[in-house]
Amino acid sequence: MTYTVEVLVDDDLAVDAALVERAAQAVLTAEQVPAGCEVCIRITTDAELHRLNRDFRGVDAPTDVLSFADDGNSSQFVTAPNLPRYLGDIAISYDRVLVQAAEYGHSPARELAYLTVHGMLHLLGYDHERGPADEALMRAREEAVMTALGLPR
């Protein structure tokens, strides 16, 4: 299937944007999302994730990944029925990628792919914070996609 994944990388960050796109595409394919959907993923810094977390979630601390799903219910904009469905935006802290990769004992590439997969699943409605059953389901989907990418635990 064909999807549009836009990856924006802040200046001075040495990021494998192709890996981010591949991980996002793998989630969309695994979840059988209809072709033509679009998503934007920004790779940025702890400072920017801290600001976004504070401004949008009221949490005054940095975090590793944030997902902003487009619920399609905005009355401010008119959308044509033939336009691709916009799933939303994801922001990932590359600073957290490096720290967490070292903490968990795996490569920054695996951590970057994992946070991309995690954020994509949130865009699609998965939420590990709803309870143990939802957490188990989301973790299983994450592991399935990571295995398909050749990056299992």
Curated annotation (Swiss-Prot):
GO terms for molecular function: metalloendopeptidase activity; RNA endonuclease activity; zinc ion binding. Keywords: Cytoplasm, Endonuclease, Hydrolase, Metal-binding, Nuclease, Ribosome biogenesis, rRNA processing, Zinc. It is found in: Cytoplasm. PROSITE patterns: UPF0054. It holds the Pfam family YbeY. GO terms for biological process: rRNA processing. The keyword Hydrolase applies. Gene3D superfamilies: Metalloproteases ('zincins'), catalytic domain. Zn(2+) binds at H118, H122, H128. This is Endoribonuclease YbeY. The gene is ybeY.
